[in-house]
């Protein structure tokens, strides 16, 4: 530890409305403290009753972020990893559903010895245990509480952090509250009333915020800050703007400029050298150097909420930044595509099919894959995207037109994609999850990209390639260049490549979960480079 006598806890709550950026605020705090040499971890407490987000609609919840140890978690854990480089685990995300599941399991086993099981103390004790678990070696633990203050679902979590604040005292805890200060364009005014009411709501459960972050387009005046300070019992120096930014990687620098990390350390009476933000300044400088622009088409069915593809978008942005290229994403609803493609892909330099589930929109994705294959457009298929690339190839090159996945047609005659037998149980928590080693063929494009024979990538899938078709596929030019070991040393297909195509790769794993702004993932780097090469070819 950094000469601290005890671990400090930072609790981040939100008010007024959801989606204000609590996760990014928490990640930024972590990055700033880390830049000062402190050892940190970040945790997320989600108030919904699902055990995890694994079976939730991406259009409602956003993406499911998968950790190395196979936990299906909230997308904010992706922000935590990308901002700090600290790998999250199953112990860093808890839900009300998981709390109740553990509680009822303990009750059935008789662990409560005949007690009447109640929210207080039994539910809150479990939440407290989650927050405090394995924290002794850390300088700071940053806990984000999901939802909005005032939500019924959040009450046990707020009570838990209140209890921890009381037990550990203000010397070891700080409460950071993020609110909205809306700008009314008709009167050209910033309105502080929502913040006042949000703090009042938080105070009603016994939590007095120490720092207020206000989300706004422009900073408040000193007079407005004094007003909030007076009505919310918070020092004016601790009322800090969370300003809108063009690039989320500006946030740590922005928060530092407004003294967020300084005020947190002042609260704890901790002295520390100024943070080393060189890598953040460097990434912003690079991001402003874009000599070219490429357009990548992403064909999916969750495009109504782009958070469903959050890590994928960030991974592409990272690769574009390090290729000194501006990225434009052309979002296409897979259900809108049919065989009468006219000029849909005329100005596109690459095509990407991300992961997904179910048969809705599948045929549109297959049409896009065929277009990429025939027209030599760089193509990347991830998870289902790889599986659909195989189906397209078998149908249109090998001419087994009834080829399909048993996910879409259980009784198809040529099931080139099928379900792993041991996973034919419950829908939730029944997939291949987490980081696994993948073995690459040395004489392959994928090896030339990674420059390693054994890689570790995260997976999230229930279906896999039926290897009975492997020889047939390879004899026609679709090559298997990566595999992983399965039960009893059986193999699972992890990577495919198309011969005689400039750049056509499918991967069963999810590389987007391991990209960060400081070290772009090699697969996305190569994909963006291939897009640039294709752009030059089109110009010639």
Curated annotation (Swiss-Prot):
Keywords: ATP-binding, Glutamine amidotransferase, Ligase, Magnesium, Metal-binding, Nucleotide-binding, Pyrimidine biosynthesis
Chain residues that bind UTP: 18, 191-196, 227
Listed EC numbers: 6.3.4.2
Superkingdom of the source species: Bacteria
A GO term, aspect molecular function: identical protein binding
Pfam families listed in its UniProt record: CTP_synth_N, GATase
Residues binding L-glutamine: 356, 384-387, 407, 462
Regulation: Allosterically activated by GTP, when glutamine is the substrate; GTP has no effect on the reaction when ammonia is the substrate. The allosteric effector GTP functions by stabilizing the protein conformation that binds the tetrahedral intermediate(s) formed during glutamine hydrolysis. Inhibited by the product CTP, via allosteric rather than competitive inhibition.
A cellular component term, taken from the record's GO annotations: cytoophidium
Residues the record lists as binding ATP: 19-24, 76
Record-linked InterPro entries: Class_I_gatase-like, CTP_synthase, CTP_synthase_N, GATASE, GATase1_CTP_Synthase, P-loop_NTPase
Active site: 383 (nucleophile), 510, 512
Biological pathway: Pyrimidine metabolism; CTP biosynthesis via de novo pathway; CTP from UDP: step 2/2
GO BP terms in the entry: 'de novo' CTP biosynthetic process; pyrimidine nucleobase biosynthetic process
Binding sites annotated in the UniProt record for Mg(2+): 76, 144
Binding site for CTP: 18, 151-153, 191-196, 227
Region (Amidoligase domain) residue spans: 1-270
Domain Glutamine amidotransferase type-1: 295-537
Enzyme class, first EC level, given as a word: ligase
SUPFAM superfamilies assigned to the protein according to its UniProt record, in alphabetical order: Class I glutamine amidotransferase-like (SSF52317), P-loop containing nucleoside triphosphate hydrolases (SSF52540)
Subunit structure of this chain's protein: Homotetramer.
Membership in a protein family: Belongs to the CTP synthase family.
Function as written in the Swiss-Prot or TrEMBL entry: Catalyzes the ATP-dependent amination of UTP to CTP with either L-glutamine or ammonia as the source of nitrogen. Regulates intracellular CTP levels through interactions with the four ribonucleotide triphosphates.
Additional detail: CTPSs have evolved a hybrid strategy for distinguishing between UTP and CTP. The overlapping regions of the product feedback inhibitory and substrate sites recognize a common feature in both compounds, the triphosphate moiety. To differentiate isosteric substrate and product pyrimidine rings, an additional pocket far from the expected kinase/ligase catalytic site, specifically recognizes the cytosine and ribose portions of the product inhibitor.
Protein name stated in the entry: CTP synthase
Record organism: Ehrlichia ruminantium (strain Welgevonden)
Designated gene of the protein: pyrG
């Amino acid at each position: 530890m950094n000469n601290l006598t005890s671990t400090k806890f930072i609790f981040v709550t939100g008010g007024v409305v959801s989606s204000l950026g609590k996760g990014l605020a928490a990640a930024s705090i972590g990055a700033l403290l880390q830049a000062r040499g402190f050892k940190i971890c970040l945790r997320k407490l989600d108030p919904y009753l699902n055990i995890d987000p694994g079976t939730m609609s991406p259009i409602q919840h956003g993406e499911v972020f998968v950790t190395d140890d196979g936990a299906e978690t909230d997308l904010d854990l992706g922000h935590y990893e990308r901002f700090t480089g600290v790998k999250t685990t199953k112990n860093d995300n808890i839900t009300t559903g998981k709390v109740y599941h553990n509680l009822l399991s303990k009750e059935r086993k008789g662990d409560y010895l005949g007690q009447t099981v109640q929210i207080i103390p039994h539910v809150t004790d479990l939440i407290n245990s989650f927050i405090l678990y394995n924290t002794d070696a850390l300088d700071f633990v940053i806990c984000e509480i999901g939802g909005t203050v005032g939500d019924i679902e959040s009450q046990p979590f707020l009570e838990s952090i209140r209890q921890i604040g009381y037990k550990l005292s203000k010397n070891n805890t700080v409460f950071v509250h993020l609110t909205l200060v809306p700008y009314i364009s008709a009167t050209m005014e910033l309105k502080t009333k929502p913040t006042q009411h949000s703090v009042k709501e938080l105070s009603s459960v016994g939590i007095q915020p120490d720092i207020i972050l206000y989300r706004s387009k422009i900073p408040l005046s000193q007079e407005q800050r004094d007003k909030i300070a007076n009505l919310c019992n918070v020092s004016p120096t601790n009322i800090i703007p969370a300003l809108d930014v063009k690039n989320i990687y500006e946030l740590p620098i922005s928060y530092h400029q407004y003294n967020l990390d300084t005020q947190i350390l002042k609260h704890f009476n901790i002295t520390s050298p100024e943070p080393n933000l060189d890598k953040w300044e460097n990434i912003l400088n690079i991001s402003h150097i874009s000599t070219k622009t490429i357009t990548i088409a992403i064909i999916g069915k969750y495009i109504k909420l782009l958070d469903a593809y959050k890590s994928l978008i960030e991974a592409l942005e990272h690769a574009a930044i390090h290729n000194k290229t501006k990225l434009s994403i052309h979002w296409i609803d897979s259900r809108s595509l049919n065989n009468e493609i006219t000029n849909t892909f005329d100005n596109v330099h690459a095509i990407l099919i991300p992961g997904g589930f179910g048969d809705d929109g599948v045929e549109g994705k297959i049409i896009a894959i065929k277009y990429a294959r025939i027209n030599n457009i760089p193509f990347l298929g991830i998870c289902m995207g790889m599986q659909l690339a195989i189906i397209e190839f078998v149908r249109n090159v090998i001419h087994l037109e009834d080829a399909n996945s048993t996910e879409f047609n259980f009784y198809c005659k040529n099931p080139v994609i099928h379900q792993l037998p041991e996973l034919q149980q419950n829908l939730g928590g029944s997939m291949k999850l987490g980081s696994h080693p993948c073995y690459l063929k040395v004489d392959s494009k994928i090896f030339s990209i990674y420059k390693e024979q054994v890689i570790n990538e995260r997976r999230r899938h229930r279906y896999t390639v039926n290897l009975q078709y492997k020889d047939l596929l390879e004899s026609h030019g679709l090559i298997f260049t990566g595999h992983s070991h399965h039960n009893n040393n059986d193999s699972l297909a992890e990577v495919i490549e198309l011969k005689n195509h400039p750049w056509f790769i499918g991967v069963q794993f999810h590389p987007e979960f391991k990209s960060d702004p400081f070290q772009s993932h090699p697969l996305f780097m190569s994909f963006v480079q291939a897009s640039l090469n294709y752009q030059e070819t089109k110009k010639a």
